[in-house]
Amino acid sequence: MIRLVAGNPLTRDAVMEEISAVADAGLEFHVVPGMSLPSTVPSFAGIALGSTYTEADLTNGPVDWDQLASAPQPLVFQATQEHLAEMAEALMERGFQGATPVTITTNGTTRLQRTFDATLQTVGNLDADLSGALVVTLGTVADDRSKYSWWENRPLYGWRVLVPRAKEQAGPMNARLTQYGAIPQSVPTISLEPPRNPAQMDRAI
């Protein structure tokens, strides 16, 4: 049996309970740690977190804003759009400036990733499609991401490109388009197949 978990499995309470049950039963198991979204997505957004930062999941129950407000920055949150206004209000009440840079990344690490820039003052009213899970990076490092952006600034990033080639010939073109950030979609226009009746081919020759 394989259990797939987003990020590091040993940070999930439900997974730990399952591992404990397996261990108590005397069964063998292996854990393959992955990188958590808060540590991975900012890199894909061009944000250099540095060696010290604080991450928190705003979707996982009550949030201790007092502790987060005094934690080492930058702050990296897992959140949804519904959490943004509450986050901004809570942190500004605890001394954060409204001009503090904030980035919001949706569909992180995929070819549909989009990163939006805001401030703590404006993030709650951001006019953007922020559906699904978000990774929010807050702090001065968010203001420098243009220096290190490498994923979303590729020349064809986000373009859907039709590749009208025979299925067997589309591979190299699809690979090149992907390198430039495009999303290739093969449209087979030619199919090379053996003759259904070899006798007809022999007569034609």
List PLM regions with ranges.
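A contiguous loop/helix-start segment that scaffolds small-molecule binding in enzyme catalytic cores
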Residues: 1-6, 13-20, 60-167, 172-175
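A cross-family signal for N-terminal binding/gating loops and helix N-caps
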Residues: 163-205
